[in-house]
C-alpha cells in the first residue's frame, strides 16, 4: 500500500465531509449518534469476536497486563460506549451559538459565532472505546474525524468503525465524516500529522513517547498534555480532617490516571501532626512513600526522595512528599516541577486560596477539593476528548466547546464606514 497516497485520499474525503457535517443540524447529528449506539448494541457478538483476536495477538506479542486490560472490550465497556453515545446526543449543540452581540457606535452589531474546527485527527493507543468517544464528540461538534488507533486494537477498531458507518448512513451522512485508518503501518501517523491542507488539529491520546513525537513532528496544531504531575499542598491554615481525606483520595482513588496526585507538599508547622496520620492511611492502601529529609525525620519508614521524584508521573501506588516552609515555596515548587495539569491547596484562608488560584500556572487549580475532579464529566462538559495543558485554544478538559472555535459576525443594515 502507498501510505502517502492512501492518507491523502483519506484527508481529501475528510475535508469534503467536514463541509457537510459543519452545516448539519442538531437533529441529524443526534440521529447518527443514536443509530450508532443501536448498531453497537446489535453487534455485540461481532465486537467481542474482533476484540478476542486483538487480545490473542496482544498476549502472543507480550503485552503486559495493564495494556491488555485497556485493550479488552467487556460487556460493561460496550454498555458504557452505548451510554456515552446517548449522553453526547443529549448535550447542547455548541455550533452556531452567537454570543456577545452588541451595538457599536457606528450602528453595526458585532458578536461571535461558535463554529467547528474542521477536520480533527485523533491518534490513540490500546483502548478501542476511545474510537467511539472521540468520534461522538467530533460528530456532535460538527467536525469530520480521522481516527488512528493502536495496531494492537486494529480488529476492534474496524468493528466499531462499521457500527459508526451504519449510524452515519442511517442519518443520511457520508461515511467519510468518521474514518478509521485501516492500516497498522506507523507511517500513517507521520502522514496524518503533516497534512495541514486536510487536517486542522491533532489530538494525541497515549503515552509520553507518542505525544512527544507528535508534538515534535506535527505540522498542524496539537491539543495535548504530556504528564499529569499533580500536587496537593496542605497549608498551615488547613482543616486537617479535610486535608486527610483530600490527600488520600487524590492519590488512591485511582493510580493510573493523569489527574492523580503524584507529589504531596506539606506546610512545615502542620507536618508533624498530619504526616503520621497520612502515612497510616497510605500504608493501608499499600502506597510507597518517598520523602525529603524533613519528611523522613517525621516518617523514617519513607524512602529518600531523589531529584527525579519531584517531576515523576508514577501512575502507581508511589507518592513523593516534601515539607515546605510556606505557600511561596509550595507555589514555586509546583511551577518548577509540575506539568501544568491539576494542582490543589487545602486551606481555610481566603487570601492564600486566591493567591494559589492566581499564581499556580496549571490548567486546573483547586481549593479544598481532590485533584481527581479534573475531568470533563465532573466539570459539566458531559464528556471530554482529552485534557490540554497548553495555553492556546483549549486548556484543561476538552469537551464539545473545545472542539470548536469562534468567528466574528457583523450585522448591519446598509452601514458603510465613514
From Swiss-Prot:
InterPro entries to which the protein is assigned, alphabetical: Ald_DH/histidinol_DH, Ald_DH_C, Ald_DH_N, Aldehyde_DH_dom, G-glutamylP_reductase_CS, Glu-5-SA_DH, GPR_dom
Top enzyme category: oxidoreductase
GO cellular component: cytoplasm
Superkingdom per UniProt: Bacteria
Primary location class: cytoplasm
Pfam family, one: Aldedh
Catalysed reaction, written as an equation: L-glutamate 5-semialdehyde + phosphate + NADP(+) = L-glutamyl 5-phosphate + NADPH + H(+)
Keyword NADP: yes
Alphabetized UniProt keyword annotations: Amino-acid biosynthesis, Cytoplasm, NADP, Oxidoreductase, Proline biosynthesis
GO molecular function, one term: NADP binding
Subcellular location: Cytoplasm
GO BP terms: L-proline biosynthetic process
Keyword NADP assigned: yes
Pathway(s) where this gene product acts: Amino-acid biosynthesis; L-proline biosynthesis; L-glutamate 5-semialdehyde from L-glutamate: step 2/2
Signal peptide: none
EC number(s) per entry: 1.2.1.41
Protein family: Belongs to the gamma-glutamyl phosphate reductase family.
Free-text function comment from the UniProt entry: Catalyzes the NADPH-dependent reduction of L-glutamate 5-phosphate into L-glutamate 5-semialdehyde and phosphate. The product spontaneously undergoes cyclization to form 1-pyrroline-5-carboxylate.
Protein name: Gamma-glutamyl phosphate reductase
Natural source organism: Hahella chejuensis (strain KCTC 2396)
Amino acid at each position: 500500500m502507498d501510505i502517502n497516497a492512501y492518507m491523502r485520499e483519506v484527508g481529501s474525503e475528510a475535508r469534503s465531509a467536514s463541509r457537510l457535517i459543519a452545516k448539519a443540524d442538531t437533529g441529524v447529528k443526534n440521529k447518527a449518534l443514536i443509530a450508532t449506539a443501536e448498531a453497537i448494541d446489535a453487534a455485540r457478538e461481532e465486537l467481542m469476536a474482533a476484540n478476542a483476536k486483538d487480545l490473542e495477538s496482544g498476549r502472543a506479542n507480550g503485552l503486559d497486563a495493564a495494556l491488555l486490560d485497556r485493550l479488552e472490550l467487556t460487556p460493561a465497556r460496550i454498555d458504557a460506549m452505548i451510554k456515552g453515545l446517548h449522553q453526547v446526543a443529549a448535550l447542547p449543540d455548541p455550533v452556531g451559538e452567537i454570543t456577545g452581540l452588541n451595538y457599536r457606535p457606528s450602528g453595526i452589531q458585532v458578536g461571535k459565532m461558535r463554529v467547528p474546527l474542521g477536520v480533527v485527527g485523533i491518534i490513540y493507543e490500546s483502548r478501542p472505546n476511545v474510537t467511539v468517544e472521540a468520534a461522538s464528540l467530533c460528530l456532535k461538534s460538527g467536525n469530520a474525524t480521522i481516527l488512528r488507533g493502536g495496531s494492537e486494537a486494529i480488529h476492534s477498531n474496524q468493528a466499531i468503525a462499521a457500527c459508526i458507518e451504519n449510524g452515519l448512513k442511517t442519518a443520511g451522512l457520508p461515511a467519510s465524516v468518521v474514518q478509521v485508518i485501516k492500516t497498522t503501518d506507523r507511517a500513517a501517523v507521520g502522514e496524518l500529522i503533516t497534512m495541514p491542507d486536510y487536517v486542522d488539529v491533532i489530538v494525541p491520546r497515549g503515552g509520553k513517547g507518542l505525544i512527544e513525537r507528535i508534538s515534535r513532528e506535527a505540522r498542524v496544531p496539537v491539543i495535548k498534555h504530556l504528564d499529569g504531575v499533580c500536587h496537593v499542598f496542605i497549608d498551615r491554615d488547613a482543616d486537617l480532617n479535610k486535608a486527610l481525606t483530600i490527600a488520600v483520595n487524590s492519590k488512591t482513588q485511582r493510580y493510573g490516571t493523569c489527574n492523580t496526585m503524584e507529589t504531596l507538599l506539606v506546610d512545615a508547622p502542620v507536618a508533624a501532626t498530619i504526616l503520621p496520620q497520612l502515612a497510616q492511611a497510605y500504608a493501608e492502601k499499600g502506597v510507597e512513600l518517598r520523602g525529603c529529609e524533613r519528611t523522613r525525620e517525621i516518617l523514617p519508614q519513607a524512602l529518600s526522595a531523589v531529584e527525579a521524584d519531584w517531576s515523576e508521573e508514577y501512575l502507581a501506588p508511589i507518592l513523593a512528599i516534601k515539607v515546605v516552609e510556606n505557600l511561596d515555596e509550595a507555589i514555586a515548587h509546583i511551577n518548577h516541577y509540575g506539568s501544568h495539569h491539576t494542582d490543589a491547596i487545602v486551606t481555610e484562608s481566603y487570601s492564600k486560596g486566591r493567591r494559589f488560584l492566581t499564581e499556580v500556572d496549571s490548567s486546573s487549580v483547586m481549593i479544598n477539593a481532590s485533584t481527581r475532579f479534573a475531568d470533563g464529566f465532573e466539570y459539566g462538559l458531559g464528556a471530554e476528548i482529552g485534557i490540554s495543558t497548553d495555553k492556546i485554544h483549549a486548556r484543561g478538559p476538552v469537551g464539545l466547546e473545545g472542539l470548536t472555535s469562534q468567528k466574528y459576525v457583523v450585522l448591519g443594515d446598509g452601514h458603510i464606514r465613514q
